Amino acid sequence: MSHTPFNRFLQQDLSTLETNLRDLLDPHLPERDHLHLLNLACGRGDETGVLAKLLTEKATTAHLQGLDIRAAEIDQANSRWKSELAAESTADFITHRGDRLRDLTEIGTPDIAFLRHQNFWNDRTIWTQIFDQALDRLDRDGLLVITSYFDREHALATQALTQMGAVQVGSIINPNSRILTDAPGKSVDKHLAVFKKG
């Protein structure tokens, strides 16, 4: 089944993600003039509209930046989201490695770093670097948000972040997570968690 931006399952997943992220972030994200979010390993950035909506509920303006190593997906994201967002939100997408954030001056100091379906157990060394550099780039009061497909992978990622000094301040087990059949125990945004810098 193709996962296009118009796929009905994808739209349901994004609606659920919006609800869960709002509940997760609301206690930790005060209102302000501007918010900057960095979306790591973003692919096509399908969740960009949801993220922009949530940010502009808390801020007058918002800027979203997406990073991924896959140039074709980044091209799709730039083509779609530069024209689809409301006037108070802007977005740009860059082909770059998440474990080399220190080389990238363009991203500045985001308020939020977001990693949807983090893939910690695929390569613990790389993902440890991604987490570490994301935390390092955040604003002093910044938040790191992850979602996970699997129970065990989420536990491993949470443990790694805690060992880096991050403080978990919220988590949600998604009651409406859509089961995927390509791997046992896999489902969409099964776990969500938010961390602050230690």
Regions found by a protein language model. Give the residues of each.
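Class I SAM-dependent methyltransferase Rossmann-like catalytic core
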Residues: 1-28
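Glycine-rich SAM-binding Motif I of class I
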Residues: 45-49
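A short acidic, Gly/Pro-enriched loop at the edge of an enzyme's catalytic core
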Residues: 103-113
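A short SAM/SAH-binding and catalytic strip from SAM-dependent methyltransferases
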Residues: 111-125
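A short glycine-rich, Lys/Arg-flanked "PGG" loop and its adjoining helix->strand segment in the class I
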Residues: 127-140
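Conserved beta-strand signature within the Rossmann-like core of class I S-adenosyl-L-methionine
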Residues: 141-149
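Class I S-adenosyl-L-methionine
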Residues: 164-198
